[in-house]
Amino acid sequence: MPVAELCRGGSGGVVVANPNAPTGRAIELHALRAILESNRDCVVLVDEAYVDFGAQSAAGLVPEYDNLVVVHTLSKSRSLAGLRVGYALGQPNLTAALRCVRDSINSYTVDRLAQTGGAAAMRDRAYFEATAAKVQATRERTAARLRELGFTVYPSAANFIFISHPDRAARALLAGLREKGVLVRWFDRPRIDNYLRVSIGTDEEMDAFCAAVQELLTKT
């Protein structure tokens, strides 16, 4: 959706995933600021699940806008998918409201073990930065290889890439990769039904993925 569509105002609320899923595309801070300015009368929630892989966080805008909530998960760049831990940033008027309803939204509250693990992950800055940098490097290397194979690869600021090939249907590639034990995401939706979303793994995993794709492309 074009950013201009989110700047019309008159909404009951605005939710923005930045970076977006499944494309991986990021919105720059000046565009997020425009969205906030255009929707002063409602809450703007920015979901930054993938922000640490190459996008700019809106967290620094929280002191300026009392209608902004920024949510982060520790499941991605902090490597804690199993603990289901996250947090929200906002001014007191919004965080107080979240505290009132949090147990109504999720009956399984964050337990002591998850809180301890989450706090430790937030303190370990060196591991976090090294992991995020490694994912980005592997992502760009994989994207370059896929472009050599003829794929369109959207610029990504997430831990996945969104790809399409002019001569191979995405659904056919999905099936071929599945037969080789390689799982990717395909979306049966208008406008994106000829694209695959490929999560970034280790260098070895991405080499295996590229080799499997190349083999499929050589088949008539």
Please state what every model-predicted region is.
Residues M1-D52:
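Active-site phosphate-binding strand-loop segment of PLP-dependent enzymes
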Residues H30, A175-K180, R185, R189-T220:
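PLP-dependent enzyme catalytic core of the Aspartate aminotransferase-like
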Residues G60-L68:
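Nucleotide-activated donor-binding/catalytic signature segment of Leloir-type glycosyltransferases, i.e.
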Residues N67-R147, F151-Y154:
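PLP-dependent aminotransferase class I/II
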Residues G82, A157, R191-N194:
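Short acidic/glycine-enriched loop/turn segments that link adjacent beta-strands
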Residues G90, I163-D167, I200-T202:
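Short beta-strand-to-loop capping motifs
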Residues V135-Q136, R147-K180, L196:
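Conserved PLP-binding catalytic core of the aspartate aminotransferase-like
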